[in-house]
């Protein structure tokens, strides 16, 4: 499995600030590249806090890319993955409701309330990048 890390950061190394507003760093051209990369991958991971704050859908937006995925025998949207300690995510978030994608929630302990909208993977092991990739590979 190939993994790509994509993150927008400010010139001084920040990904966000501590205000309740979303910090916009990316340009429209950046977003075009993000969407192109997204369509070529199997999964996208977003932390629980960005899900709470921004409510992203994390969909493949380009209709031609969606059609290519379906033609290749894939779902039109890539799998969505998140990490949470608390499980404090609303099942009404677009992460869970938008698109035709498999959804995975990783947690270091048992959580309830999301089993009807995602595959919940709870573990007492450390949740490392290797652990996440291994678990996703097991599930296709």
Q: How would you label these PLM feature ranges?
A:
Residues 2-139:
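Active-site ligand-binding patch in enzyme domains
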């Amino acid at each position: 499995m190939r993994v790509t890390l994509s993150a927008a950061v400010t010139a001084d190394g920040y990904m966000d600030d501590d205000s309740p507003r979303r910090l916009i760093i990316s340009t429209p051209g950046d977003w075009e590249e993000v969407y192109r990369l997204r369509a070529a991958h199997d999964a996208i991971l977003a932390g629980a806090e960005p899900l709470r704050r921004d409510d992203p859908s994390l969909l493949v937006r380009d209709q031609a890319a969606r059609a290519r995925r379906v033609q290749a025998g894939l779902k039109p949207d890539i799998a969505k993955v998140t990490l949470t300690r608390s499980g404090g995510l609303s099942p009404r978030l677009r992460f869970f409701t938008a698109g035709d994608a498999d959804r995975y929630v990783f947690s270091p302990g048992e959580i309830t309330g999301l089993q009807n909208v995602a595959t919940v993977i709870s573990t007492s092991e450390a949740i490392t990048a290797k652990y996440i990739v291994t678990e996703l590979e097991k599930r296709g």
